[in-house]
Amino acid sequence: FDGKPILPEAATPKTANLTRIAYGEHPHLTVHYYSPQEWQEIEDDAKGSSDSPRARVAKDLVSMVQHHGIDAATLLAGGQEEVFAVGSVDELMGKLNDYVGENGCFTALVKSTEILLPLPELQGFEIIDTPGMNDPVPSRTQKTRDYMARCDVVFFLSRCSQFLDQSDMDLLAEQLPAKGVKRMVLVAGQLDGAIADDGFDRASLAETEKNVRTRLPRRAENEIEKLAIAREKLGDPKIAELL
């Protein structure tokens, strides 16, 4: 925003907290923690022998809390919300790293955050950065669904190297809400990964990039068309029209 990054960048699910960004006259941060019951469920998942994504993320979260020496039960019993009024965007970013940064002291215990910024371009808009619909933490997934049902536009990110694979298509088929969303934008991320996979037998980087930029839109058109037809047959005309 205004040429500055606000949210930390990371590819690991443990840092993917749901964040709402909106306009405010002064920089403001609200942190929402897991409830004691939600955290107990995460601890129970971490104790099991399963190697599922949900169990792996739970173990990572519990390990982070132990690493920072935090008494999770005491902290969460003190309330599920903490509010910080800060003097500048830079100060907000420094504070934010403690709660959503990859190595933040309290990152593992945070379910979602709300950020208010004094930026005129945000007036009348809300931006929701979500962990995605396949988030291994169930309570975050439900909150993502709730927000999506109120959004006008959804940006769906998919890695170029696995662009719209079966996992992505299953998510679109099963989780896209039938109300609220008026437009969906596909975003192909991590282009360098696709170039590395595609360029081993091509003469130049330019040729590789051209092929990737041609191949991905073609795949998107074909896969989305098939999904739209399937949703129409299942009696979901609104979803079919959105796609």
Residue ranges and their predicted role:
Residues F1-L243:
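Globular "head" domains of long coiled-coil molecular machines
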